[in-house]
Structure formats: C-alpha cells, structure tokens
Amino acid sequence: MEDNDISFSIFGNSDDILDNTKKSKSNINNSGSSIFGNGNENNNNMNTNNNNSNQNNNDINYNNNNNNNNNNNSNNSNNSNNNNNNINNNNNRNNNNFNNNNNNNVNYFEQDVDFGENAHSSNYGDNNNIFSDESNNYNNNNNNNDYNNNNYYDNNNYNENYNENYNENYNNNNNNNNNNNNNNNNNNNNNNNNNNNNNYYNENNNQQQLQQNYSNNNYNNEYINNFNNNDNSYNNNNNNNNNNSNFNNYNNNNNGYDNSYSNSNNNNYYDNSNNNSKNDNQYNQQQQYYQEEEQQQQQHEEFEKEIEQKEQDSSPINVNRNPNNSVMIKIGEVEVPEDIYNQKVEKWRNDFNSIFRNLETLEIDYTKATFGLPKDTTVRSIFWRIALGTLSKDPTTWVERTNSSRKKYETFKKNYIINPRNSKDQDADLQQQQQQQQQQQRKPVSLIDDPLSQSEDSLWNQFFDNENAQREISHDISRTYPGLGFFERLDIQDIMIRILFIFSKQYPKIKYLQGMNEILAPILYSVYNDSHWFNNRDVFSKKNYDKKNKQYEHFDFVFDQQYQQDYYPDGPIQYPTNSNNFNGAGSSGSGGSVSRKDGGIGAFLRDPQYFEHDSYFIFESLMTIVGKWFTSPPSSPQPPPRVQGQFKKLYDLSERDASDQAVNIVVVDQCLRMFEDLKFIEPQLYSYLKQDLGIEPHLYSLRWIRIILAQVFPLDSLLILWDSIFKESVTEFLPYICLTMLIMIKDQIIEKDYSECLQVLFHYPVTQDMPMLLNTAYSVREKIQMAKQQYNIPISTPVSTPLPTSLSRRSIKAYPVSTSSTIVNQSTTTNSSSSSTTTSTTSANRGLSHSSQSYRSSSGSGSGSISNQNKGNGQSGIFSSFTSTFKQIINDLNEYNEEFQLAKENEQLKQQKSKLQKEVDTLKETQTHVISRLERILFSFVDFKQKHIHDQDNFESVDAMEKEVTSILNEVLNSQTTIANLNNSKNRLPNKSVQQSTISQQSTTPQQSITQQTSSPNIVLKQQQPITVISQQQQSQQQQSLQQEQQQSTQQQQSTQQEQQSTQQEQQQSTQPQQSQQNNDNSPFQQYNNDNRQEKISLEDEVFFDNQFVSVQSTNKEFQLKTLSLPNVEIHEDDLVEVKTHDSTVDEDEDGNPITEQYNYKQQLEARWGFNK
C-alpha cells in the first residue's frame, strides 16, 4: 500500500466529526487547536479541533470512535463503517505507534489547517517510513483510496462549515476522489520521502532544519497552491489572519517532537496537553484579540499603500512632466519648461505690486491682509517686515536698512559661530607674534587654545559650549513640522539651528527656550518661498486622519485644484535678482524703481542669497513683541551681593537660575485676562469652564498664546492667521482669536467632564476655514468692547481705525504734559503715566483697520463729577460717552502744546518750506473738522435736553456739559491776541460780543433758545495767501498778552456762571413739554450765527505744526490763532488717550533719533467721536 494512504486515513477519523461540526457552527467558529484522540480503547473522548486556528472554537467532543454506531451522521455513508473499523483496529494493535506518528504532525495540523488541507496530508505521509509495521497494518484496513480522499475533503468540508459559501467547492473536490494531482503536497512529500525522513528521524538534532523544510514546503508553496485550487476568495479572507500566530504554533509543535518520539509508550501524552478545556477558552480569546489587531494593522497598511498610490497618480510631476511640450531650459542644475518658468517669474514680480496702494509712493495696502494674503503669494515676508517694524514705513530707507541688517548678521556669524580649526589657520601669524613676544619676555607659552583648556578665553572651550547649546536646539528642530519635506532638509535644519543659536547669544536674558523653533519655522518658510521656486505641494495637503481612533472613513486627502495642476521642479530654483544695483546705493525718491527688468526693490528685498539674514531679523522683531512670554521675572527683588571678587560671579549665576525657575507671570496673566473677556459674550461657557469644571485657562491657552498658535493649525492655515495677527497687533488681536476658538468648539465642551474637556482643548479640532475664523474674531472683538463701554469698564485692547489717506499728520511719542499750558495737573500726569488702558470705538469697516492705529489711554486719578452723577440714573452709558468725547477733545488739544516743542526743534534744523506747506494744508482742514465736531456735540446735547426735559438731574448735567463745550469752542474761535496784528478791525471777532451773546442766550427761555438756533455756524474759507512765520520774540509777547486776557476772561466767566445757574433753574420750571419739541434740527448755539458774527472768518491763514496752533502773519492780515489755553476740567482715568496708528510706529535709527510717521487725523477723530460723514 502506498504511503499516501496513511495520511488520508488519519484525516478520516470519522464522519461523525463532520456531522457534529455541522450541528455546532458556533463552536466551529472558535476553534483554536487541532487535537486527535490518544487511541486508547477505553478512551471514548477524542478531542478534535480541526481547521481555522484564527477562530476561537470550543473543543468538539467526538465520542465512541471505537464504535460503529455513528454511520448515519457521516457525509460519505458508504465508507464510514470501513473507516471506523480501520481506526479501531489501529487503535487496538498499534496504540503507541499511532500516537507517535501523530504527535508532532497533529500539532502542525492545528496550525496549518486554515491554509489548506493538502499540507496536512503531506506531513503525515512523511512519517510512514519509520513505523512501517504500524503503517502497513493501518493502511491494510484502508484499501479504499476513494474513501481516504473523501475523508481528506471531509476535512475540507469542515472548513466549508466556517463559511457556507464554499459548499460548491467541497462537492467538487469530493467528486475528484481518485485525482491525486490535487494533493500537490502529498505528491511532493512522497517524491521527497527519503529526504524528509532522513532530516526528521535519522538526524534528531537537526530539528531547526526540519522546521525550515516544513516552513518552506508546506507554508510558502503547498499551502498557496492547494488552497487556491479550492477557493481563491477564501484564501484572501483567512490567509492574512494566521501568518504570525500559526507559524509560532508550528515552531512550538516541532519543539515538542522529541518528547513524543522518545516517550513513544506514553499513552497519556495527548491527554495532558490537549484535554484542558478551560485553558483552551482563554487561549482562544487571546488569539481572537491578536487576530483582530492584525486585521486592523493590515487594513491600515493597505490604506497607506492606497494613499501613496493616490499621491503618485495625482502628482503633476509624474502625470504631466512637460504639460505644453515646451522647450526645457536648465536653471542651475534643474531643468524646467521655459514657458512655465517665465510665468512663475512674471507672477513673482507682479506679487510685489499687489500689496501696495500706490506704486509711486509704495504705500502699503493693509486691507489685503484683513483675511490673510493668498496662500501662494511671494511677498508675505515683505509684508511681515513692514508690519512688525523690521522695515520702516518710509520706503526710502528700505535699501539702506536692509543692507545694514544683512551686514550685521554676517558679523554675528563671525563672532558667535566659532571653529578653532579654521581660526588656527587664519590667525597663524598672530599666534607666532604672541609666541615670539612671550619668548622674549622669558615667560611660559599659554595653553589657552588647547582643546583641554578650561579657560573662558579659550576658543576650544567656547566651541564645546556652543556645540552643547546647538545640540539642545537640534533636538527640537528635528521635531519641527514632521512630514513636511522642506523642514526635513538638512540645510534648512542647520540654518534654523544657527539662527536660534545666534539669537540666544545676542539675547542672553531670553536665551533659547522650547517653542521658539515653532515660531521660526513659518518665518523661514515664508522668506524662502518668496525667493525660491520649489516643490511645496505637501504644505497645502489636508490630512484629517485621526490616528488615535483609527477612523479612516473620514479621511480627506484633497488638494486644491490650483495646486494639483501646478508644475513643481525637481529641485529649488532661485528667482532672478540683481542686487548690485542696490548694494549700498540706496534708491531715489520712492525707494527704488519697481519697473526695472531685474525686479527692482522687490527683487532686492527677496534676494535668495540673504534669506537666512532676513529671516533672523523678522524673528528678532517678533521676539521683541512676544519675548516677554518666554521670560520669567524673579519672584522677589534680588538683594545686593554680599560677596566680592571671584565669588561674586557665582552669586550672580545662582540668582539668574532662581529667576529662570520662577513662575512666568506675564504669559499666565495674559491667559487670565483673555479668559475674563469670555464672560461678556459667552457667560454660559465661562461659568462652565471656571465654576463647574474649574479648568485654569493657562492649562490650554498658554500654548496657544506663547507660540502664536503654531502647534494648533497646519502651516498653510497658520500663515493666513499670522497675516491678520501681524496686521492688527500680536498682543492685542491674538486673545480674540483664542476666544473665537473656544466659542467655535462650545458644543464639544458643554456637558463634558473634566478629562474629556481637556482632551478637546489640548487637541483642538482642525478647521480649514480661516476666513470664517477671522471674521468671527473681528465680531467678538467688537461685541466685547461694546459691552465694556456699556458697563463703563476700561478696555485693555486697542481698536483699529481706518487707514490714512492724503490727509495726515505726524505722530510722536507720548511725552509728559507740561503744567503751564495744559489742563492736566501734575498729579494727574503722574498717574496717567503709570499704566495704560485703551479707549474703544468700533470702526465702520473692519477691513480698513490696522493694529497700530490704536488709542491708548492712561489711567487717571479719579472720575469727574458728571460721570458720578450719571451712575444712578440708568443713563450711565450715554453720559459716559458724551463725557469721554468732549474730554478727549481737550486731551487732543492738550497734546498740541507738547508737540509744539518738537516744532521749534524742527524749525531750528532748517525744515524745508515744502514740508511746512503740507502741514499747513493738513492742519487747516483739521481745525475746521474740530470745530464742526464741537458743533455736532452741542447739537446732540440740545437734542438730548429736549427729549429729557422733565428729568431735571439729566437736564442739568447735559446743560453743564454743553456750557463747557461752548466755552471750548469760544476759545478756539475767539482770538483777542491777534488784534494788534490786524489792520482792519472789521475782520475780527471781539470777545466781548461773544460773552454778551453767551449771556443773552443763557438768559433766554428754552423756547427762545430753540427759536434762536435756526442756523448752524457758517465758516467761509478764503483763498490761501502767502504766509510768513512770526518770529519767536513776537510769539512770546503774544503768549504773555494772551495769558493776561485769559485771566480776565476766566474771572468774567466765573461771575457769569452764578447768574447762569439761577436763570437756568427758573427757565426749567417755566418750560412746557410742548415747547421742547420744536425745531429739533436747528443749530445748537446762537452766538455763532451770521447775525452775531461781524465778519467772516478765514482759516486759510493758519499754520498748525506738530499738534500746536502756531501764529502766522499773512499779507492780507486775516484772522489768526494763538497758543490755546483751556479751562480746567476734571479728567477721568478712561479719558486720557494716546493716539497711535499704524503709521505712528516709532522707529529709531542707529543714531537713536526718533523717526515719526504721518497718519490720518481727520478720519481718526471721526472714528473716535462716532461721527461719519
């Protein structure tokens, strides 16, 4: 009988096996091992777990194998009786041999049963030569080969029970009973019988080789062939799930062969190893867990391969290497299509012109960055330099300043990047001279430059210290934006390390701290992108894969259509520049020609050779703003050192370390103030985070604020946010964006517990809609500031104003207010300089806003009596607005006196007449604008009095404010000091007439006052005449005369105020409600109408320079204004305002002289006072 019959008969244990497995499909799906019975006659339980080791099958008990009573349950009823008899005879005669023959192979069967049953038959067929007697006896009982083949496929039927879809395959295989070709593994094993037997039995020590043979023959080759013959789809389902676990089982089973072979007489071997049902259940559960993990891992690998394939398919380089079949040109070492290269260069030049409002003056248009610049722009670095103050607002200084900064960075590199190896070659002559001097003086040679020297002056010692610092920086650089090819380049990483190292050396108080690399990375990318054309396609990809939850179905791998169709070169290509034309030469007029073929000043500012230099100074400018968030102030003031000499240095170092370890109060305070503003717009979210959960704001917002959202949003979205943040103000606009981020995830935070809420805050959901985020941030800012105005709360954040137009004036720093010519006393000035808050107004158009156009107020020494009266009347918001408005006017006029001092200094420096003429034109219109605004305020007072005529307290308060504003207007329009300079007395406005008209107005009844106010003041501007400035002596005389007249006028006003109060009380009692509603649209004051004015006033002959009314003398001797002195008014702490716009950034050149810029004063006052034309 052939050897193959042994393997076939072994598989044909009983047809009862197949019937029982059909009856218990649930158990079959959980099979974990394959175990045959031990062959004893008295052992009625044969534990058999056939096939599918990846399923956790419970043990299937097949009873009474020695009996022939289960014939009705077999699938092949004709052969079942013979099979059972044969097995019984084998079990009686050759019990031990049967066990030995199946000892190792049964274990191997439980591993390989899922891969294909042909492998099992071959393994059992390998062992038939050793136990020849038992095999012959066993095979004699199995003369029916067809039955053996049926039993073989009965085992396959067991696999079919796992999935009912394989019934057809099972039936087809059973029909091929005599076809031994299907059993490829059996044929291979029979042909190589001698080799297998020799390796397996004659050489018992070489069991690892046997394992290799089994693995190669059965696992890799035979399993695939036989299993594919049965069903290909089933191979895909089960093959991948059993690679690791089954192979391990196979190795373990082979290791147990020696024991089974040496103890061939041990009939209880299988009983001890396979009859533990409790352990099988635990093992099956563990196997099921491993299989699920492997399945998920396999799905993930397939998914990643699919993603890579999509990237390759969608890559424009692979799909369309040369889209237009144009001529290829070589730029450096890279070949690119000529037409695409020309288009890129043309776009690069046009981008520079896109950010300016006027190309002749290079006036930048900040509205372009309201919602961020375009993603693919190449002028982002220039915009950032101007917005952060790296470049001034004056374009004529750009070339000179850029050359100076680039030379300065080269000096930093030479001083801080030390290499003793190179220094030895460069300074060889100097060292020889020093050695000669030392030999002449008979002194020993110094070992300062020895590599083992510990001296601070040693170059080697400094070199090793620098290496340690750079190594610390490199750890963070390697983790910066992983996955982006730009930051994985070694040359880019070296540049980032060098920039951060030089900064730490240049600013030892700040040094380098973790997070600075996140701030430098977007800056370096922007500067490099502005000067190079390279493959930055991965920056614009959107990957929303959730690695933690392994949610692949929400994965969105989408490129914008624009970037998908773009062509990208194989390597970086520098844009064409010609910096020789600008190298230290400066530019004429407008700061350089933008129409030159070499790219003009735009090409000079984006020179690829200096992108590292430019990146450093942008980073330095940004760190001057946010550097306070990286420093830690000492918890207590440092006492003076008690030691001197060499130990003093050690004392200073210990104090420095203590300062570094102190709590960073600045950034934490910023987080707390930001969170407190949340209660004005989202009180529910505020109370839930603070009271219900007790989450401290700095736990999550400190990382947002310190590194300016660098780790929250992807790089392409972060660049858009930074455009708007730099345009507005980093320290002022960034908190509003953080509040907006909290509001947008409100639904994900509410009703969450402490840990879940922190999880959402620490891993902020990524959003790609940056315009929506910025638009919401602008709205949040307006709502918060309106709420603070309503509750009369000092606003700590500035509000932007419209951009300047041609009407502008220069702005300077806030200087202490003088006591001689201002209305603020010394105590108020001292308090106002101690701290700063901000007054707020909302601009009508958010897009025309700029961060540096802010109003900063100083905290004063107390509030006025008017605001205190209004608090209990329910009208505090309205009265506070009126009070702040007219007091702001006083402060603006007060500021003129301080700027007059700078005007004198500028006149001494021989200012040109053209510049003075521009200031004259601007300030003439400004004075007209101030007068018109005062008139509108008075009109508002009258209108308010008419509507609240029955409210006596409010009526008196408004009336008092109206009188104060009237007195201010009198001082502006009344000029008694110019009488001596006027030849025509008819062309002046006497002060007495104004006083008389004021008294007559106050003495009339409210009804008469309304009827008299039938027309607004009429101010006629005459044509401009030649202007000559009065000398300083004349000005001093005029100021003295003006002060005397002011003293007289104040005495008269005090006497008349008492009469006014008495008359007002009588008027209010006699006034009827119906009379207060007449003529609502009339002018608010009668004393300035055409009847009371004797002559028309011309404001064309006034000169206003640096916030001061300056007396001038014209040929026609028209009306002129002198130094203004205003009545004392109590100033509230919220009303002192420092005017600052985007053009008022004070920049100091190398000599330390302040460089002031111009701004639109007219639009600024219009926005602040709330009056829009």
Curated annotation (Swiss-Prot):
MF GO annotations: GTPase activator activity
SMART domains: TBC
Region (Disordered): 22-203, 217-324, 425-446, 823-872, 983-1015, 1054-1089
Alphabetical UniProt keywords: Coiled coil, GTPase activation
Biased composition (Basic and acidic residues): 299-313
Domain of life of the organism encoding this protein: Eukaryota
Residue ranges with Low complexity bias: 26-107, 127-203, 217-290, 431-441, 995-1015, 1054-1078
All copies of domain Rab-GAP TBC, residue ranges: 374-729
PROSITE patterns from the UniProt entry: TBC_RABGAP (PS50086)
Coiled-coil regions, chain positions: 163-214, 885-930
Positions with biased composition (Polar residues): 314-324, 983-994, 1079-1089
Function: May act as a GTPase-activating protein for Rab family protein(s).
Protein name as annotated: TBC1 domain family member 5 homolog A
The species this protein was found in: Dictyostelium discoideum (Social amoeba)
Lineage: Eukaryota, Amoebozoa, Evosea, Eumycetozoa, Dictyostelia
